[in-house]
């Protein structure tokens, strides 16, 4: 959606296909980090964005046993918004779609499920999709797969995926929030029987809770029963014990099967993958959506003029991968390190009271909080908007006076 918005703003004809009838999907990435908020500021949309209902996280804190530890302090970041904005992803996507519709070259088609790619010789020339009214084919000089970690586009393209072992999965669920609940701590490191860590995200009138569990332990937890699961969570966050009684059915608990992977090549002639379709990120740091947004900004910066002129080649697509791949590799390496040190080697196994190594380092060397804030809030290569918004007379011009698509 962000790439579609940026390209339409720059005068490129865009069709965005969304599989569902709306953007309402619970437990999607619901955090926008300072680097993403800086992009919104550069687009002149920050004031409108901040009017949307959201909460602001200005530091990340964790509870290790009964000790509160500040993990990251965003106050020194060199950006306008020194906080993480907690906002439902459907609100953000609707926000982008609403602003995208200001541009005549932006089209959004809902309930359009991409099922296959259209090939002409050795290049990708479009997609086939199904809708409630039937199948259709959309031709384009460039197909962008931004359809997530279970990407149909990358699967149909036959792109090679490099997979990395991950020791965790996550159960996501809601806990009603009470007025006397303590101030938000991002993570609770209190050993449970199977839950290694509990993430609590403030959503205003409820907590979005993520129970980090050993990889593949979901069936075992289900077999023990929902009451046992509620009790384990209540031992980690006693203040939520009464609210947890409302968790009455496993249908209210969604399993995220965590994986970390990336494509060896993000592109084919006529095709580019970005975001989770190109590189599935770990939930460590909650930065997946922000990495995807940075991909979109970089792709728009590198491709807008070529697309407007109808001259995009595979070298141009390769340039997008070159621009973004180093940051993705470094981010995944840090995430894998944290996963292995925090979740695999004793941060919450039964009977383990040890403090994870990364937490011990932050406690011993407080200046590390700034580095953690930089990693979470900015990433290794924050992108900036280089495309220019074309004047109204271009967008309002007759088709014959516009550059070729």
Would you name each region that the model predicts?
Residues 16-17, 145, 188, 274:
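Generic enzyme active-site microenvironment
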Residues 301-405:
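C-terminal helical "tail/cap" subdomain of flavin- and related membrane-associated enzymes
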Residues 100-115:
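A conserved beta-strand/loop element that lines the FAD pocket in flavoprotein oxidoreductases
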Residues 258-263, 278-290, 326:
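Glycine-rich phosphate/pyrophosphate-binding beta-alpha loops
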Residues 112, 123-137, 142-254, 258, ...:
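Conserved FAD-binding catalytic core of PHBH/FMO-like flavoproteins
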Residues 5-28:
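Glycine-rich FAD pyrophosphate-binding loop
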Residues 33-101, 121:
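Active-site-adjacent segment of FAD-dependent monooxygenases/related oxidoreductases
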Residues 256-273, 329-330, 347:
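FAD-binding beta-loop-beta segment adjacent to the flavin cofactor pocket
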């Amino acid at each position: 959606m962000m790439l579609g918005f940026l390209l339409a703003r720059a005068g490129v004809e865009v069709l965005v296909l969304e599989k569902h009838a709306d953007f309402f999907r619970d437990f999607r990435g619901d955090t926008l980090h300072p680097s993403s908020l800086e992009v919104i500021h550069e687009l002149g949309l920050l004031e409108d964005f901040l009017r949307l209902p959201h909460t602001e996280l200005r530091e990340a804190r964790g509870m290790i046993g009964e000790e509160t530890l500040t993990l990251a302090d965003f106050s020194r970041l060199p950006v306008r918004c020194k906080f993480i904005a907690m906002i439902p992803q459907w609100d953000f996507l609707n926000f982008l779609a609403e602003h995208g519709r200001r541009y005549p070259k932006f089209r959004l088609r809902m309930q359009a499920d991409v099922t296959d790619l259209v090939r002409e010789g050795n290049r990708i020339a479009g997609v086939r999709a199904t809708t409630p009214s039937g199948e259709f084919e959309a031709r384009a000089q460039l197909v962008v797969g931004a359809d997530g970690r279970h990407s149909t586009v990358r699967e149909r393209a036959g792109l090679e995926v490099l997979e990395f072992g991950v020791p965790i999965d996550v159960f996501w669920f809601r806990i009603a929030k009470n007025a006397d609940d303590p101030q938000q701590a991002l993570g609770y490191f209190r050993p449970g029987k199977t839950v290694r860590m509990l993430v609590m995200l403030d959503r205003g009138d409820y907590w979005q809770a993520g129970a980090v569990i050993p990889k593949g332990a979901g069936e075992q937890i289900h077999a023990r029963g929902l009451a046992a699961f509620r009790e384990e969570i209540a031992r980690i966050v006693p203040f939520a014990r009464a609210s947890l009684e409302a968790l009455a059915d496993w249908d209210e608990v969604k399993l995220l099967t965590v994986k970390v992977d990336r494509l060896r090549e993000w592109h084919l002639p006529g095709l580019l993958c970005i975001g989770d379709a190109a590189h599935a990120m770990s939930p460590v740091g909650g930065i997946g959506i922000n990495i995807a947004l940075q991909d979109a900004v970089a792709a728009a910066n590198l491709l807008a003029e070529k697309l407007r002129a109808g001259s995009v080649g595979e070298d141009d697509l390769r340039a997008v991968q070159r621009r973004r791949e180093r940051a993705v590799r470094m981010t995944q390496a840090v995430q894998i390190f944290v996963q292995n040190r925090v979740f695999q080697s004793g941060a919450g196994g039964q009977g383990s009271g040890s403090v994870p190594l990364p937490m011990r380092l932050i406690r011993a060397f407080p200046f590390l909080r700034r580095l953690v804030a930089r990693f979470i809030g900015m990433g290794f290569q924050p992108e900036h908007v280089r495309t220019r918004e074309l004047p109204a007379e271009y967008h309002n011009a007759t088709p014959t006076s516009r550059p070729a698509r």
